[in-house]
UniProtKB/Swiss-Prot annotation:
One of its GO terms (biological process) is ATP synthesis coupled electron transport. It is a multi-pass membrane protein. InterPro entries: NADH_UbQ_OxRdtase_chain4L/K (IPR001133), NUOK/Mnh_C1-like (IPR039428). It comes from Avahi laniger. It catalyses: a ubiquinone + NADH + 5 H(+)(in) = a ubiquinol + NAD(+) + 4 H(+)(out). This is NADH-ubiquinone oxidoreductase chain 4L. GO terms for cellular component: mitochondrial inner membrane; respiratory chain complex I. Pfam families: Oxidored_q2. Core subunit of the mitochondrial membrane respiratory chain NADH dehydrogenase (Complex I) which catalyzes electron transfer from NADH through the respiratory chain, using ubiquinone as an electron acceptor. Part of the enzyme membrane arm which is embedded in the lipid bilayer and involved in proton translocation. The lineage of its organism: Eukaryota, Metazoa, Chordata, Craniata, Vertebrata.
Length: 98
């Protein structure tokens, strides 16, 4: 069982590293954030099932709901930015360019 936890933590660290490396593209950042949320969901589910915490069974579902809301808002932002500017570079976007 510890190898599963190690793999999930490694997946989270890889997604975090991907967020840091690909921070200039909005789509890549959103994909890495989704990977982080998926690994957090899996890790919290496994911890709750292994510890037999019956009061916390709803926590992973709540995390999954917030991840879906984050994905919907991120995709709406991506569509808005790509329709307005024609690209998804975060560095080129500035409020001073009006």
């Amino acid at each position: 069982m510890p190898s599963i936890f190690t793999n999930i933590i490694l997946a989270f660290a890889t997604a975090l590293l991907g967020t840091l490396v690909f921070r200039s593209h909005l789509m890549s950042s959103l994909l890495c954030l989704e990977g982080m949320m998926l690994s957090l969901f899996t890790l919290s589910t496994l911890i709750i099932l292994n510890m037999h915490l019956t009061m916390s069974f709803m926590m992973p579902i709540l995390l999954l709901v917030f991840a879906a809301c984050e994905a919907a808002i991120g995709l709406a932002l991506l569509v808005m930015v790509s329709n307005t500017y024609g690209l998804d570079y975060i560095k080129n976007l500035s409020l001073l360019q009006c």
